């Protein structure tokens, strides 16, 4: 196994809150998958939830070396928790096609947040 990509992102939670205040649900609709949206709608801390998901997806896009462009969209990356609560990443559409093309066999996700920031790291492994 070899490391194919590494990406890290940090998000200021207040910036996400400001965008939501200005544009309502537009950012959440653009960033979240349908499954994540369902959780976001009833989450006790929706801004923090969205900030953490945004950080993971930005980190994943960096790990793939593409950013969010050329057919890749935030909602093609879905963050979920396994049975132990560990964050995991599921891919859809162009993101899945790219992962298969690059030979990605494992994706490792770490996620942390404090009062003002959320950060994530994604490692892609063959």
Swiss-Prot record:
Protein name as annotated: Holo-[acyl-carrier-protein] synthase
Cofactor(s) needed: Mg(2+)
Catalytic activity: apo-[ACP] + CoA = holo-[ACP] + adenosine 3',5'-bisphosphate + H(+)
Source organism (scientific name): Salmonella paratyphi B (strain ATCC BAA-1250 / SPB7)
Keyword set includes Lipid metabolism: yes
Similarity field: Belongs to the P-Pant transferase superfamily. AcpS family.
Single biological process term from Gene Ontology: fatty acid biosynthetic process
Subcellular compartments: Cytoplasm
UniProt cross-references to HAMAP family, sorted A to Z: AcpS (MF_00101)
GO CC terms of this entry: cytoplasm
Keywords associated with the record: Cytoplasm, Fatty acid biosynthesis, Fatty acid metabolism, Lipid biosynthesis, Lipid metabolism, Magnesium, Metal-binding, Transferase
Biological role stated in the UniProt entry: Transfers the 4'-phosphopantetheine moiety from coenzyme A to a Ser of acyl-carrier-protein.
Lineage: Bacteria, Pseudomonadati, Pseudomonadota, Gammaproteobacteria, Enterobacterales
């Amino acid at each position: 196994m070899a490391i194919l990509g590494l990406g890290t992102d940090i998000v200021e939670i207040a910036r996400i809150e400001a965008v939501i205040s200005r544009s309502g649900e537009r950012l959440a609709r653009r960033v979240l998958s349908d499954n994540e949206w369902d959780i976001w709608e009833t989450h006790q801390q929706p801004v923090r939830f969205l900030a953490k998901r945004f950080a993971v997806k930005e980190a994943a896009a960096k790990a793939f070396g593409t950013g969010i462009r050329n057919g890749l969209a935030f909602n093609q990356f879905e963050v979920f928790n396994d049975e132990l609560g560990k964050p995991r990443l599921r891919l859809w559409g162009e993101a899945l096609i790219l992962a298969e093309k690059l030979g990605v066999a494992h994706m490792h996700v770490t996620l942390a947040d404090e009062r003002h920031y959320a950060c994530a790291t994604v490692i892609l492994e063959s």
